[in-house]
Each structure stands twice: as structure tokens, then as C-alpha cells.
Amino acid sequence: KEGYNVYVYSIGNFPTLRCMEQIRYDVAYHNLNVKIVSVGAGYAYGSLGASHHATEELGMMRTIPNMVICSPGDPVEAQVISTVSANYEGPMYLRLGKAGEVIVHQSLIENLKIGDLIPVIRKPNANKALLVSGSILDYAVNRIREFNDLSDVYSIPFVKPLNIEQLHELAIQYPDICVLEEHQKSCGVGSAIIEVINDMYSRSEIPYYPRIKRIAIDDKFYSVSGSQAYLRKLANLVL
């Protein structure tokens, strides 16, 4: 039947990499109202080996036209993004953790629009910004608080599109920006941010090009089984 808001769900790579051609032609090309939901982002299913390490699918999904991509940082973000997805007409990919993710936000997030970045920690004397995508957010927040680092922290619940106005403000405000993500460095969230800021600089929309550091997975497979924490450390996803 027509007219439904369709949700498709599976683990990590299986509703994305395995059926990429069908997503491209049958969903995105026709701009259909289909929401693709995966659980097990990054190394959440690390004990099951490389077949279940969802570490490349963001890069592939964000190259597909018409596709909105969400990667919530905690259950509060996941809740509001679920509502956003139900009200959105068109293809969307929701990249979730596994279960038991730590709640970072202590209150509901209101008026979230597609593409928005969410401030998590703001300091009056901050000289750096840490942009975090996905469920590694709680680790990042804890590390910043532990070391009393002078960084503001922002969650990136939407990988595509990105709020250009917000990124423009960040590029002007912070000379140093770090992007942390549980995904391959190539074609990930950090790449998307660099592309946007590079375009701003090439059009003389920002006075200087901020230093952008990416903490992400190198161009390799980790053919081992282990906990998510173990594999994150193995892949140098550390602050």
C-alpha cells in the first residue's frame, strides 16, 4: 500500500552496505518516505568481528542524493530524532548504538531541526571546539570534564545535511576544531565538515582556515573480536 512512513531495521552493515544498490535506485532516486534504521554503530558489535563493525557505511550513505543521515549521541537525541524522522517526508538513515548508551543530556532537546549541532558543554574562556558524532559522545564529555580542557563540546546528530550557519559561526569563533567519530576517517563526519569549511574559505566567507584535527578510524580493518571499548582504544579513538 502507498502512503505509509516505512521503517526498515537491522544490525549495522546489513540494511546499508549489503543493499546499497537498492537504497540508491529504489528509495533515494524516487525520494521515497523510507527510514533505514541500523543498530550497532561503529564497534558496538565488536565481539562479532569485522563483518559486524559498522565503520564505513556513513561515507557510502552520505554520497547518495536525497538521503538525510542521523547519528544521535545519546538516548535523548535518539528520542527527538525519532520524532523528527516521523515528521520528515523522504529517505533518512538513522545510525544508532546498541543498548545501554549513557544519557548525556539531562533535559529534553526542543526545536531541533535537521542539520542542527547541539551544544553540550560551553565555557566562557573556551578556545577550541570538540565536535562529536554518535554514541562516543559520553566518552568525549567525560574526558573534557576530567582534564578540565578549555574546549566547548558539540554533538553532531545529523551528518547530512549540516547546519551551514552554525558551522560558519564555529569556524570564525574557534581557531582549533577537533572532530571525534567512530567511523572511517575517509568520507566520515570530519570529512563532511572539512568540505563545508573549505568551501566557505574558498568563497572568502571566513577570514582564516581553522586547524581541524580528525580523530577517526584509519584506513584499515581490525580483524579481531573484542568489546567496543577495547576496539575504540585499538583504533586510537582517544582524547
Task: Please provide the spans of the model-predicted regions.
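Thiamine diphosphate
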Residues: Y45, G97-L239
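Conserved thiamine diphosphate
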Residues: K1-A129
